[in-house]
Curated annotation (Swiss-Prot):
Site entry (Important for activity), positions: D267
Record-given protein name: NAD-dependent malic enzyme
Cofactor(s) required for function per UniProt: Mg(2+); Mn(2+)
Subunit record text: Homotetramer.
A single cellular component GO annotation: cytosol
Record EC number: 1.1.1.38
Binding site for a divalent metal cation: E243, D244, D267
Active site positions, chain numbering: Y101, K172
Organism (species): Pseudomonas syringae pv. tomato (strain ATCC BAA-871 / DC3000)
Keyword Transferase: no
Reaction equation(s) it catalyzes: (S)-malate + NAD(+) = pyruvate + CO2 + NADH; oxaloacetate + H(+) = pyruvate + CO2
Positions with a binding annotation for NAD(+): R154, D267, N416
Amino acid sequence: MTTTSRPLYISYAGPSLLEMPLLNKGSAFTPQERIEFNLIGLLPQNVETIEEQVTRVYSQYKQCASDLDKHIYLRSIQDNNETLFFRLLDSHLDEMLPIIYTPTVGQACQEFSKIYRTHRGLFISYPERDRIDDILRSATKDRIKIIVVTDSERILGLGDQGIGGMGIPIGKLSLYTACGGISPAYTLPIVLDVGTNNRELLDDPMYMGWRHERVSGKEYEDFIALFIDAVQRRWPDVLLQFEDFAQSNAMPLLEKYRDELCCFNDDIQGTASVAVGTLLAACKAKNETLGQQKVVFVGAGSAGCGIAEHIIAAMRIEGLSESEARKRIFMVDRFGLLTEGMGNLLDFQLRLAQKSADVAGWTAGTETFPQLLDVVTHAGATVLIGVSGQRGLFTEQVVRELYKHCAKPLVMPLSNPTSKVEATPEEILRWTDGNALVATGSPFAPVEINGRTVHIAQCNNSYIFPGIGLGVVACKASRITDRMLMAASNALAECSPMVTGQGDAVLPPLKEIQQVSRKIALAVAKEAQAEGLALETSEEALLAAIERNFWLPGYRAYRRRSV
């Protein structure tokens, strides 16, 4: 791991040093550093340890009246002293993860222009498309290794949030550091401001983004190409993560660029990887194979279809043919089961459509296509996954029907935020007599049922993407492939308390997430080497590289460097 014992030579001093979040120590500057860096009189006289600072800021955090207030407060610490911010998260990750990311970050995105305090990251707007190289050069960090970028068109389940979507890259990169040990000095959040179709934002006098309807079509594609080209010129080896792009753009962008640069779409690939890791863990715990499952999805967008394709790939690794695997996956959208006769399906949806002959007779009543209950009933479903963004779609009747086919069904309502969840864990467990295995997209409290406490696994992408990023950075992989993602899923499954015999939760507790990220990083890096996408080394060398790149929040001694 990155140590804090070696001194760091810097040329900043006085107020400018205190204004640099990556370097500021606040009250922890030593007496000698205060003299050497002209800080005498700029800070209270008492010198504190980072532990004492954490105690103070945590006390202030607890005084915040609402979750949004807590989010704003944590962001203010991050913008003042990044080391202290991440040390605080390290001490209270369980408590603060829902504050810095889902579900609270959704409200922060909606209120972005109202709660804006200071700059962080880059805002690249369409009217300034001829100056993207200049904008990237203005980034104060030179050694960027991971970028998270959004165009804000599909922020969580909240839709188009304009530049307010910047909260997502900031939050995601905070998790890269807190969970995966990526130094904040190597991360950069970016929002692509291509306008907004959110009328409420366009009419809001406080909205800070470009007041224009969204650019689309060739203009949009050309703008993205300009951005990608500029990023490759500035940081040719960077990992670029696409985040919260609309369904119509997310998959095409990933398909276009995944073989040209090291890129990754967390909504599609990260969600798929953690979902498959969860499903693999449940199968291992039940002594079943993935190929024995019948999986029903509610929601057939890019995220749901991405999970489905990842499951199919995992089934094929187990020995099923592609056609056999596809017959075990059922995608239901607002019109019903995706079938060959359904019009207006996108290419990635067509690949998952069932043959009409195979589902003949499944439709009840006058519906043209089989509905969710029909599908669960006739398919003999054992797994139910929700990525619809619609509250309450997993009704009691649907869940009880699922329970008829499987003594321990896996139910995964993954929609965010909490207000959009398809069913709550309490409901699911009540309807299955406490026998369902439950993993959710948002955090939920443990459920008391039948005299026992059931801990609810949060099927959160933070279990996956930080480890993938750490592995890519450690081995310097040039691409991210499906096999690397599958390696991540398998590594996550092996960490499940149900598999290791250390508990009844499907996924490990968040307090273990840094160790989980290390294991995922090793699996990803080994697969990258096996595919010839990284320089081949020994496992010992990989482990050393992972530890060398794992940053821990602690203050280093500073020495003055002459300009």
